[in-house]
């Protein structure tokens, strides 16, 4: 029997406390948990076993076993992230290196320095994390509860004491995943069949926000490479996704591009919105054509360096995020049951520009997408021509 495909969904909401005393109790707990995470990280660097770290964290910071487990889990995640990116784990700055470097500048003063110090304290001391478990109504320490059609988050602050905060969040659109979470919570309350959900509390600009993450069952893959693929070049010139449709035998059927210009100078939220719209357009195209998606295995995209004489190009490359767009396409494809094929990017730009672009009268951005297609057919046997 095949295992069900699952995807993790993370949802954000704001918390409103009933009294200032409850809010201060949670802030004090967040400061202790943040310190416990840093302590656990240092002990892991020293080579201490996880079980011993967990016991020492619980005893030293007055946290229950589940909070201590959460601090250890966070510390392990930070350590593994450094190792995956080939970074020195001893140089991690809790609170953010960019803020740390800004605060080191002696010429900052007044309101600007006060804002940076507040942001530094919030990022360094404003964290609380509890891993979900199915046996304890989904989560032992941070648990949503209903009362008179209102949703509250029950927070364990230690010594068998709990405080409650009202969850402030409304569904923003018709298919908002927040409605899915509320439906699953209501069903679990009625049937007693709970599901694990992980809750993270963070302090941002004086407000406490909760991030609730849980797993969602995905539909089986129904759109496969058997009917052909749509090759996507995420870093086509000039910084837009280009696509080319191929038949099962590899012949070109159609091609085009998804306009994504004017990204430079935009705020991060607006850039993310445009990237999501582009990803939805790719998925809409794949569903309409009934074909799988072929993507390049992108790593280490050059963005230029200071002194190369092209500051304008460096600025554009710095604000263009093909990896972010790739991740969004993968997320949406999993939800829609569309297969995503990875191919090696070696020489696709050269082959596309020198062979397929003149042969099929394609542009410089669309040619490499045509070069992706001869390679996906061999991935059926786990092979690659390049």
Model-inferred region functions:
Residues 1-386:
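Nucleic-acid substrate recognition interfaces
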């Amino acid at each position: 029997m095949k295992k069900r495909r699952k995807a993790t969904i993370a949802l954000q909401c704001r918390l409103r406390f009933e009294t200032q005393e409850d809010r201060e109790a949670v802030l004090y707990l967040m400061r202790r948990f943040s310190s416990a995470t840093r302590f656990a990280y240092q002990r892991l660097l020293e080579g201490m076993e996880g079980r011993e770290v967990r016991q020492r964290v619980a005893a030293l910071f007055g946290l229950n076993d589940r909070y201590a487990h959460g601090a250890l889990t966070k510390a392990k995640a930070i350590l593994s992230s450094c190792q995956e990116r080939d970074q020195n784990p001893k140089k991690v700055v809790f609170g953010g290196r960019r803020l740390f470097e800004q605060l080191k500048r002696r010429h900052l003063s007044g309101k600007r320095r006060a804002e940076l110090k507040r942001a530094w304290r919030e990022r360094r001391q404003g964290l609380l994390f509890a891993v979900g478990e199915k046996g304890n109504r989904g989560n032992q320490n941070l648990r949503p509860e209903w009362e008179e059609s209102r949703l509250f988050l029950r927070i364990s602050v230690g010594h068998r004491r709990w405080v409650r905060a009202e969850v402030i969040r409304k569904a923003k659109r018709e298919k908002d995943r927040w409605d899915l979470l509320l439906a699953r919570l209501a069903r679990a309350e009625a049937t007693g069949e709970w599901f694990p959900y992980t809750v993270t509390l963070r302090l941002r600009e004086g407000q406490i926000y909760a991030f609730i993450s849980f797993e969602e069952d995905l539909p089986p893959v129904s759109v496969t490479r058997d009917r052909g693929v749509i090759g996507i070049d995420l870093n086509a010139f000039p910084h837009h996704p280009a696509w080319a449709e191929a038949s099962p035998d590899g012949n070109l059927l159609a091609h085009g591009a998804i306009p994504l210009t004017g990204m430079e100078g935009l705020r991060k939220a607006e850039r993310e919105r445009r990237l999501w719209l582009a990803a939805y357009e790719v998925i809409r195209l794949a569903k309409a054509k009934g074909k799988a998606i072929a993507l390049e295995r992108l790593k280490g995209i050059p963005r230029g360096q200071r002194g190369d004489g092209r500051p304008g190009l460096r600025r554009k490359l710095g604000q263009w995020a093909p990896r972010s767009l790739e991740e969004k396409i993968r997320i949406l494809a999993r939800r829609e049951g569309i297969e995503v094929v990875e191919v090696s990017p070696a020489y696709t730009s050269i082959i596309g520009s020198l062979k397929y672009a003149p042969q099929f009268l394609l542009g410089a951005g669309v040619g490499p997408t045509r070069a992706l297609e001869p390679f996906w057919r061999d991935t059926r046997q786990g092979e690659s021509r390049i």
